[in-house]
Amino acid sequence: MMTGNLNGGGRGGEGPCGACKFLRRKCVKGCVFAPYFDAEQGTARFAAVHKVFGASNASKMLLRLPLHKRLDAVVTLCYEAMARIRDPVYGSVGHLFSLQHQVMNLQAELAHVQARLSTIQRFPLQSPQQMQPPSFDPAHNNEYAMEPSNLDSVWGEEHLLQDGTGDGDFQELASQFVSRYLPAVKLPACT
């Protein structure tokens, strides 16, 4: 954790800051790194900053900034350095592209869900109690349409009921309807 020890002096009895510890030098009063790189975790963070930017360049950048902006600059330097070490080619830009891609995917998914929701709101599904059983007049019964072999070709394809969109209620309703009114038809089990 980066501390905001803004008294800016040497570390007194605490020992050197993480940056001076890494550089193996004495931490003097007024050390620019002391408020931001503590002795415990600051050494590893400063090692990354030193590897990517160099201690001298990091020091110059911090000294040019007003005190109230230095903490943000150190956080940014550490993030950029760690990202550059993880991905030497793209650095933090690779992470930004990944996040932008994730945002675009989530926006597309949201639009899809909103479209499905508006469709469902316009055409609400009826519950099994509200459904009227079809009237089957034996005089007009089409034997060809009701033969199990013909219905199996219509209902036998699993993707008709399971399109992967999460319509579990609709699939259950369809299964109940088929089992009640078309007992000869065997539907694939819902997963």
From Swiss-Prot:
Residue ranges of domain LOB in the record = 15-117
* Domain of life per record: Eukaryota
Instruction: Cite the PROSITE patterns for this sequence.
Output: LOB
Q: In which tissues is it expressed?
A: Expressed in shoots, roots and floral tissues, but not in stems or leaves.
Regarding protein family, the annotation reads: Belongs to the LOB domain-containing protein family.
- The protein here is known as LOB domain-containing protein 19
What is the source species? Arabidopsis thaliana (Mouse-ear cress)
